[in-house]
Every structure is written in structure tokens, then in C-alpha cells.
Amino acid sequence: DGSGTRETFEGRALDKGTAAAGANVVNSNGAMKTAIAQDPNAIGYVGIGHLDSSIQGVSIDGMVPSQENAANGTYKITRLLYMNTKGEPAGLTKAFVDYIYSPDGQKFTSASGYIPKGRD
């Protein structure tokens, strides 16, 4: 299937069920956002980083989808994204990883709609 967002939604919101046979299934947040925005009767899902004024987020258990609510765990349908390297990063890879964890990189991550995390 190829969509981690869909896998998360199906596993957490559909109680491990699947979409109806006639559902318009798409393979990216961008395609889902476009499909929702173009159909006034559409119901779909996108990552929090893709929410904007073209679509309306849905509250779950009274909590709106936001960076803050996802970060503090009160919005329950979330997933983590990871950066992985083969061994210790070096050269440009290390520079990129260092940037992502720098104050500027954390600001960029947040401005892009994602939740910055420090190094563990």
C-alpha cells in the first residue's frame, strides 16, 4: 500500500479495519488533501503537517489536531517519523543531521508542521 499515514489511521481509528470497497484510496498526504478539499462531502486523513485552511481537522475525544496536542499525547492518532543512518553519519549526512537537531533545524521542522524532537 505504501502509506504510513493510512496504516496509522486504519490501525488506530478504524480499529484495525480497512476502508470501504468504494473508497477513493490515495497514496500521499498531498493527494488526500486535494481530494478532501475538492469534495464537500469528503472525509479523509492527512498528517498534521499538511493541515491548512483548505481542509478542516476533526477533533477526537474533544481534542483538535495540533502540534501541541500531538506532542503532549492528548491527540491520540499520531505516529513518529525517524531519521536513520547506516553507522555513524559523516560528511554531508552528518551536517544534515546536525542541522535538523540545531535550533534553526528545529524551527524549520516546526514551521513545516511537524513536531521537533531532540536527540535521544
Language-model regions: role of each:
Residues 1-120:
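Exported/periplasmic ABC-transporter solute-binding proteins
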